[in-house]
UniProtKB/Swiss-Prot annotation:
PROSITE patterns: GRPE (PS01071). Residues 1-17 have a biased composition (Basic and acidic residues). InterPro entries: GrpE, GrpE_coiled_coil, GrpE_head. It holds the Pfam family GrpE. Keywords: Chaperone, Cytoplasm, Stress response. The keyword Transport does not apply. NCBIfam families: PRK14140.1. The gene is grpE. It is found in: Cytoplasm. GO terms for cellular component: cytoplasm. Participates actively in the response to hyperosmotic and heat shock by preventing the aggregation of stress-denatured proteins, in association with DnaK and GrpE. It is the nucleotide exchange factor for DnaK and may function as a thermosensor. Unfolded proteins bind initially to DnaJ; upon interaction with the DnaJ-bound protein, DnaK hydrolyzes its bound ATP, resulting in the formation of a stable complex. GrpE releases ADP from DnaK; ATP binding to DnaK triggers the release of the substrate protein, thus completing the reaction cycle. GO terms for biological process: protein folding. This is Protein GrpE.
């Protein structure tokens, strides 16, 4: 009996669905289907265009990045060219005068100009001088000597200067360190 009731209820539900759904052959259903197909087509087209725009944007971004990297050092190169010109003039001048003191003076001026310019423009600093306290984060001890009266390890000789760029060590200074005999 229960099974019969279920079958009747199922048939009633199917009849109600058939009443609420428009006939597939009706003109309003065909119009609605055409509208939906048109909307789907428009959305697919929009999706493909947006996808192409994104791909073009990604390619343009990659090209801009490559150009940025390629030309990032242009200003530094221009500065180096100026320093090379000055160095060339110093060499040419020394060939004419054969005066070692003049050559030394010219090269010292070029070194000062390079360091000053790079400090101002690029925040590149040179460090490592005799008398400075030894700092293992900035200095590399190549040799050590024991010395009376030294409270903290200090630099007594510099083999190679160190450089830092924006407070980041590019190269440690190679130094000789004096420390207490204790």
């Amino acid at each position: 009996m229960e099974e019969k009731k279920r079958c009747e209820e199922s048939e009633k539900i199917k009849e109600q669905e058939n009443e609420t759904l428009p006939n597939e052959d009706s003109p309003s259903m065909g119009k609605k289907v055409a509208e939906l197909e048109n909307e789907i087509s428009n959305l697919k087209d929009l999706y493909l265009r947006k996808q192409a725009e994104f791909e073009n944007f990604r390619k343009r971004l990659e090209k801009d990045k490559e150009n940025f990297i390629k030309f990032a050092n242009e200003n530094i190169m221009k500065d180096i060219i100026n320093f090379l010109d000055n160095l060339e003039r110093a060499i040419d001048s020394s060939k004419q005068s054969k005066d070692f003191d003049t050559l030394l003076s010219g090269i010292s001026m070029i070194e000062s100009e390079v360091l000053s310019s790079f400090d101002k423009k690029y925040n590149l600093k040179k460090f490592g001088k005799p008398g400075e306290d030894f700092d293992p984060s900035q200095h590399e001890a190549i040799s050590i000597e024991e010395k009376e009266g030294v409270k903290t390890p200090e630099i007594v000789e510099v083999y190679q200067k160190g450089y830092c760029y924006n407070n980041r060590v590019l190269r440690t200074a190679k130094v000789k360190v004096a420390q207490s005999k204790n």
